[in-house]
Regions:
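Beta-strand-enriched cores of mature, soluble protein domains
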Residues: 1-157
Length: 157
């Protein structure tokens, strides 16, 4: 068995619509839907935009963590479309959670003081230049921004 190795894929900056759609308390926790308004991504092998075509079905859990469930599209700079889906977790202190309603305050939080991780998967056309993404399991390290969220995404080798 070998150690985990990664390869940097891209950094993505996603803009989320305000206000979020608040469902409220459910048997599973407090549900919110954050709509993707747009964004950009760029890396050594791929770059492009994130059209307004997806969202994050966020669940604030009873244990104080946040479960994320994202589905979105990526459009490469050469016109190809890629579907991405990922789950993940955000874990932060109750004081930090209080900043989530204010984007400027959320961006001011030091990302090293909270845990924000994702596990992206991709679907690309099998006959296209990004078919290699169909075989990638990735991990993302996230941070909160004034416009939404940003991630550095790495392929697991």
């Amino acid at each position: 068995m070998s150690d985990v190795e990664t390869e940097f894929l891209f950094e993505i900056d996603a803009e989320l619509r305000e206000p979020n759609l608040m469902i409220g308390g459910t048997p599973d926790g407090s549900r919110m839907i954050a709509h993707v308004e747009g964004g950009t991504f760029e890396g050594p092998r791929i770059k492009g935009t994130m059209p307004a075509s997806g969202g994050d079905w966020v669940l604030a859990r009873a244990d104080g963590s946040i479960k994320i469930d994202v589905r979105a599209a990526l459009t490469t700079d050469d016109g190809h479309h890629i579907y991405t889906s990922y789950g993940g977790r955000i874990v932060m202190s109750p004081e930090q959670m209080g900043a989530l309603g204010d984007r400027a305050a959320a961006e001011a939080l030091d990302p090293s003081t909270y845990y924000f991780r994702t596990n992206p998967l991709f679907e690309a056309a099998m006959d296209g230049p990004y078919a290699w993404l169909n075989h990638v399991v990735a991990v993302g390290i996230g941070r909160l921004t004034a416009k939404g969220v940003a991630y550095k995404v790495y392929a697991l080798k």
